[in-house]
Amino acid sequence: MEQFRNIGIIGRLGSSQVLDTVRRLKKFLLARHLHVILEDTIAEVLPGHGLQTSSRKLLGEVCDMVIVVGGDGSLLGAARALARHNIPVLGINRGSLGFLTDIRPDELEVKVAEVLDGHYLVENRFLLQAEVRRHAEAIGQGDALNDVVLHPGKSTRMIEFEIYIDGQFVCSQKADGLIVATPTGSTAYALSAGGPIMHPKLDAIVIVPMYPHTLSGRPIVVDGNSELKIVVSKDMQIYPQVSCDGQNHFTCAPGDTITVSKKAQKLRLIHPLDHNYYEVCRTKLGWGSRLGGGGD
């Protein structure tokens, strides 16, 4: 197992609970004589911290591991910035769900100590890369750990588009939009739209239409190495948008092409040894417990 000596900390802004947890984490890491580096945005709201700071973009170059304090959204943002550095990322949950940030604040010291002592699991989560092209020229690019979404923006009209997989025409659709999700994102927006839950170890991508104008419009699971192409109808009178993990919005014009494929770099997500994906799903999604009151 790797030795972590230089630890980066990213925290969600706007929460006093996050700041309290960051202070606890900082104190704990310094007590173990580790080098702690704060992301510059969280450092600005921690006066007198006395630590080295770094931009998120460069944090992956100076750290052995980065700990994210916040919710899943905070980790999504960190993943897009850190995946290219192949650096392990650990999440402490200060959000509402915690599919990705799975360490509770009350167990911070115990679980982080286990990880630092080499007792942890590593999951490699792949990201998607999206590109919007107009007349063969790229007008927007973005990465996503969860999903790439084509949606109508402020318009209430449906979008008409064609779907191609690996150069082969699949279908045309008229829908409120389209979600292209990773296994990580299968428990996010795609799940709300009726998509399947995919285990994070699967090498697959799910395509989920949003309120399609046909009963046969159903989610499709394809090979993770597939290249997807979505062509917006030239007859559209609205300008739909493409978003990556709810960020990096690009406005499309009729006739634009959106290409989505797997990104070469992956996120190295760290979990404590007792991490159980099905327990996380059962807890977060309200699945039933064992029959007969047997607990977990």
Swiss-Prot record:
An MF annotation (GO) of this entry: metal ion binding
Keywords (A to Z) from UniProt: ATP-binding, Cytoplasm, Kinase, NAD, NADP, Nucleotide-binding, Transferase
Reactions this protein catalyses: NAD(+) + ATP = ADP + NADP(+) + H(+)
Enzyme Commission designation: 2.7.1.23
Any one GO biological process: NAD metabolic process
Domain of life: Bacteria
Function: Involved in the regulation of the intracellular balance of NAD and NADP, and is a key enzyme in the biosynthesis of NADP. Catalyzes specifically the phosphorylation on 2'-hydroxyl of the adenosine moiety of NAD to yield NADP.
Similarity remark: Belongs to the NAD kinase family.
Protein name per the record: NAD kinase
Naturally occurring in which organism (per UniProt): Pseudomonas fluorescens (strain ATCC BAA-477 / NRRL B-23932 / Pf-5)
Taxonomic path: Bacteria, Pseudomonadati, Pseudomonadota, Gammaproteobacteria, Pseudomonadales
